[in-house]
């Protein structure tokens, strides 16, 4: 093997990822009712440009074309999410039209020879549930159980890979704590309560999967980052440990160890009110690592201590160059360090799947082509980190590039492009970027 050859295991899973609200559009078609993101987008100043997902990539009408394009680009696996408000538009109502959309999508996926990974929850909570208190209320867990059961009953034998929850950190902390995401609340007590209930839904889905005797694999996806201290000063080291507890350990430790990290419980103090939202049996329900751990990784953080009144009393040091269009540092060495740490501290041999990794770049369409060399470079360097981890015995079994299409990038609207396929939002024309063509060649050779 030459020094520049990175060949992956024969069974390695190559895929691409999307999510329902970011690509589907058709928000008032097919019996769908509003999600919390439809409502959030109407709040002035919450989303850049006042953008929303009403049309997005219009995947609702273009799904056949999109799946065919995946096939042409050589993908073997496709990770997508189901829009909960398409399935449960109101309390006690199951919408057959919504189920049919995903049935037809799965027909296309199977015709194209792709293997599906279905995400049950990627942030589009039905607004009617939020009106009842959303993720701060335990009743939402029962609504989720009904929804997950319907999906499993309808599609159970067609799904090879189940992703219970995508990024519980973002859904809870950004949604109920910082207010950056829907529903836009700024209440730390609500945020930690929401996080607990969302983690419980992972356990609920895992139990349903067992009870129904489904043969597909099931697991959760966490967004995790490698955290470095800005200096060796004790206060900066302690600040970095807090940041790690906030974004990584608060979600990984319940899944793998059945408890919340004690140092963070102590630090959060009154915001948790003695963890009074934790009832007997909750932690046992959550502590179900499943068949795999999904990881979404984009960048590292460099943290120093502050003396302000914020929750963590930390701040992010300015990212070092090079950075993506999000301003996120490109640091593949941290990806390798994170994977090594995850296996050592948490997964301990459980298969790991990279369910998202990619970069927003300022792409330019010139003569019908997009030479996104920055994105290509980002992906290639991060795949080298994956390869190194595997070579050292790491149980990494697959990589899903984010994202298949340019799409609605949450609070950033349409101002950031993560896709390996360019979208002209006026015409809905799809144009594979240079990174997609490189990825096709790479998958065909199972390496580079």
From Swiss-Prot:
Family, as annotated: Belongs to the glycosyl hydrolase 1 family.
Keywords on record: Carbohydrate metabolism, Cellulose degradation, Glycosidase, Hydrolase, Polysaccharide degradation
Reaction equation(s) it catalyzes: Hydrolysis of terminal, non-reducing beta-D-glucosyl residues with release of beta-D-glucose
Transmembrane domains' residue ranges: none
EC number: 3.2.1.21
Protein name stated in the entry: Beta-glucosidase B
Gene: bglB
Domain of life, source organism: Bacteria
Signal peptide start and end residues: none
Family annotation (InterPro entries): Glyco_hydro_1, Glyco_hydro_1_AS, Glyco_hydro_1_beta-glucosidase, Glyco_hydro_1_N_CS, Glycoside_hydrolase_SF
EC category name: hydrolase
GO molecular function: beta-glucosidase activity
GO BP term (any one): cellulose catabolic process
Pfam families per UniProt: Glyco_hydro_1
Residues annotated as catalytic: 167 (proton donor), 356 (nucleophile)
């Amino acid at each position: 093997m030459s020094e520049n050859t990175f060949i992956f295991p024969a069974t390695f899973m190559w895929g691409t990822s999307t999510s329902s609200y970011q690509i589907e559009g058709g928000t008032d078609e097919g019996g769908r009712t509003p999600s919390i993101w439809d409502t959030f987008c109407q709040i002035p100043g919450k989303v850049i440009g006042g953008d929303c997902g009403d049309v997005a990539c219009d995947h609702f009408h273009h799904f056949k074309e999109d799946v065919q394009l995946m096939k042409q680009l050589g993908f073997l696996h496709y990770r997508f999410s189901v829009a909960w408000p398409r399935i449960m538009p109101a309390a006690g109502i199951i919408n057959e039209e919504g189920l049919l959309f995903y049935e037809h999508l799965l027909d296309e996926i199977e015709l194209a020879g792709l293997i599906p990974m279905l995400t049950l929850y990627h942030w589009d909570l039905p607004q009617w549930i939020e009106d009842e208190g959303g993720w701060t209320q335990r009743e939402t867990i029962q609504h989720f159980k009904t929804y997950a059961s319907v999906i499993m009953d309808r599609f159970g034998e067609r799904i090879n890979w189940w992703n219970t929850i995508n990024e519980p950190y973002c859904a809870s902390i950004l949604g109920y704590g910082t207010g950056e995401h829907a529903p836009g609340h700024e209440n730390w007590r609500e945020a930690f309560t929401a996080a607990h209930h969302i983690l419980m839904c992972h356990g609920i889905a895992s139990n349903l999967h067992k009870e129904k005797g489904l043969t597909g694999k099931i697991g959760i996806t966490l967004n995790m980052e490698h955290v470095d201290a800005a200096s060796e000063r004790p206060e900066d080291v302690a600040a970095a440990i807090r940041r790690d507890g906030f974004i990584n350990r608060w979600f990984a430790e319940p899944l793998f160890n059945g408890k919340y990290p004690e140092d963070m419980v102590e630090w959060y103090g009154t915001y948790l009110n003695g963890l009074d939202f934790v009832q007997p049996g909750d932690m046992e329900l959550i502590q179900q690592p499943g068949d795999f751990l999904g990881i979404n990784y984009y960048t590292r953080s460099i943290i120093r201590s502050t003396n302000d009144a914020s929750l963590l009393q930390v701040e992010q040091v300015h990212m070092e160059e090079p950075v993506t269009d999000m301003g996120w540092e490109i640091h593949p060495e941290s990806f390798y360090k994170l994977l090594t740490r995850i296996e050592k501290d948490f997964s301990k041999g459980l298969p790991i799947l990279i369910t998202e990794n990619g970069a927003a770049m300022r792409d330019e369409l010139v003569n019908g082509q997009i030479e996104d060399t920055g994105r290509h470079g980002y992906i290639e360097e991060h795949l080298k980190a994956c390869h190194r981890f595997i070579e050292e015995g790491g149980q990494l079994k697959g990589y899903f590039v984010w994202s298949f299409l340019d799409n609605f990038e949450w609070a950033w609207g349409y101002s950031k492009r993560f896709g390996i396929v360019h979208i002209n939002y006026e015409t809905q024309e799809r144009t594979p970027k240079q990174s997609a063509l490189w990825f096709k060649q790479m998958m065909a050779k199972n390496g580079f």
